[in-house]
A protein has these predicted regions:
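N-terminal sensory and localization modules of signal-transduction and trafficking proteins
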Residues: 6, 10-14, 126-132, 171, ...
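Second-shell loop/turn segments in exported
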Residues: 21-23, 55-62, 101-107, 114
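Short hydrophobic alpha-helical segments used for membrane anchoring or interfacial signaling
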Residues: 42, 85-93, 195-203
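Amphipathic coiled-coil signal-relay and dimerization helices
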Residues: 48-50, 89-101, 203-210
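Solvent-exposed, extracytoplasmic
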Residues: 68-76, 112, 148, 161, ...
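Extracytoplasmic/periplasmic ligand-binding sensor regions of membrane-associated signaling proteins
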Residues: 77-83, 87-175
Length: 211
């Protein structure tokens, strides 16, 4: 019995250590997401460029696209292989033809998860974990023999308002893969037939290692 108790205690300690690691990893990654989206908000003039009421000159359009591309390059450099995708949803569609990551705000409003964005009073909010609707590459993979598996992401949203009317004129979305969020690459190996499970607030399974 003493040997059994020792094994049980070892297992409990290892489990506690692993759960602490997952919690710490998620906290650190959430802090990283907040830092990135706040930096974007600080550096970019989103209320001006995303508002459909503003007619942008060709020079302004080029400036915005170049500035966003530079920011994303900086993010990749500072946080390599950390984020899955970043998207700009705008009521101003002038830039959409020039920037592959810009989409119409009206398209976002038609999504079933748009209500979860506007329901939050804070400018920055986390969405429910869901399958990504974006490809991390602009390459068309439909006819290529590449992995097309579903990518689960935690989306984080920044609402952009008209400074006078307080109407939403745009939304910035930053996605992190759920595997990156929990730090899957560094999770301790618990042994055969043992998986890690992560549930949301509704007890819905959103992440599982192994099978």
């Amino acid at each position: 019995r003493g040997f059994q108790n020792s094994l049980l205690n070892d297992a409990q300690n290892k489990l506690k250590e692993t759960l602490n690691y997952m919690e710490t990893s998620m906290d650190m990654n959430l802090d990283t997401i907040d830092a990135v989206i706040n930096e974007l908000n600080y550096r970019q003039e989103f209320p001006y460029f995303l508002d459909e009421k503003n007619v942008l000159s060709e020079k302004e359009q080029i400036y915005f696209v170049s500035s966003m591309q530079e920011e994303l390059i900086n993010i990749r450099y500072l946080y390599p292989n950390k984020f899955y995708y970043g998207a700009v949803f705008s009521s101003n569609n002038q830039i959409k033809e020039k920037y592959e990551r810009q989409y119409s705000l009206e398209d976002l409003k038609n999504k079933p998860y748009y209500n979860e964005i506007i329901a939050e009073k804070d400018n920055i909010s986390y969405g429910m974990v869901r399958n990504s609707e974006f490809k991390s590459s602009n390459i068309n993979i439909e006819n290529l023999n590449l992995d097309k598996s579903v990518i689960q992401v935690l989306p984080t949203y920044l609402k952009v308002y008209n400074l006078s009317t307080r109407q939403i004129v745009g939304v910035i979305e930053v996605d992190m893969e759920i595997t990156k969020l929990v730090g899957e690459d560094n999770l301790p190996v618990m042994g055969n037939n043992v998986d890690y499970l992560l549930l949301d607030q509704n007890n819905k399974l959103i992440y599982q290692t192994g099978t």
